[in-house]
């Protein structure tokens, strides 16, 4: 059960972020609901790892004194499932922007896809998408990219622990991946396309787990608000 005191002392809740919402949209909605329900003027609410608007799934929300735990949740491994499309690319590496290149997929075979996926296992350097929330001189990279400005994003060290493909609906490829914090799945997909000497675009993404936290234990925003 929830109470005013329990939220102030600290709670961590698991939310299934809906498609089209930003992670901050979820935080704002939950904060507003708690403040209204319990007549609290101010309460800290934050999330432990951004999900893009076009992604769904697990969002760890920390409330009250539990906001001190946010970094520890951010540092945990993440597991995602999703779908990418072989043969087309976009500037954002997903469907936020329109397709800008089309490639022939005649010479792509299933064995090659499986082999390349295994080459991604391990530690590596990744370049985040220019359409990302990474800050460059105080501004978000996506803000600069949308203005058509040149964007140079610093590379980061990541690790892929597991990467599995399901190729039943080629050129759409379903996948599951477990990775370190800070990994951009869009960049993994883009790099996968390049490794094929082709192109690839992320078309669906869902976060399934963050450390021990699992989507199976998450509530929708509406379910949580109705329970407080």
Task: Annotate each language-model stretch with its function.
Residues 1-228:
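Catalytic/RNA-binding core of pseudouridine synthases
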